[in-house]
Amino acid sequence: MTTVSHELDDVIHEIACVELGDDKMAFKSDPIMARFKETGTELWVDTGDLQKAKSIWKTEFTALTTNNTLANQVVQTGVVDEVIGQTVSRLKEVAPGLSEEELVTEIGFVINCRIALRLVHSFKTGVSVELHPSMSRNIERTLNYARRYYRVCPEYFTIKIPLTPEGYLAVRTLRKE
């Protein structure tokens, strides 16, 4: 599948999005991290695991970064089992013609969004989300999924695009937008 229909895209967007509350948590400062930050360094935490991030987060941290491997680790904990079940049911209802590969891709998109949105909700900071490597050689798919991630949370999501010739072309197009 190179693109998702606008109708299906709207349904997936609805499934992927969750309301963000205003309950930012308070975190402690770390003097060593403060010294790093004073040098102009931006400190990012590399995890999709909300509890792990909460246990190490300091006020000096700038953002969080996730990727497909980290998202898979979260999936293995069972935290998103309900989301997966609801997503499968809803997609089979509205798009019964999706192939297994298309269904898995869309479920992955929803899971990545939900994991990243949980982090945004808790930390009220930027979170990078990564396009799946299977899209790395297809400009149209790269553009489509990058736009879809951006649509979910433009204020907080940074979209990581695979470093391929097609990725460079996609970035050039997206920067113009």
Describe each PLM feature range.
Residues 18-23, 38-42, 54, 111-117, ...:
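Short, functional N-terminal and low-complexity linear motifs
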Residues 2-48:
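N- or domain-start disorder-to-order transition segments that initiate the globular core
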Residues 24, 28, 37, 52-54, ...:
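Context-gated lysine
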Residues 31-64, 69-73:
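Glycine-rich, flexible N-terminal cofactor/catalytic loop recognition
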Residues 7-11, 31-32, 52, 82-86, ...:
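Exposed alpha-helical structural elements
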Residues 60-61, 68-171:
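Active-site beta->alpha loop and helix N-cap motifs at the rims of alpha/beta catalytic domains
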Residues 28-37, 120, 150, 171-177:
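Surface-exposed amphipathic alpha-helices with a cationic face
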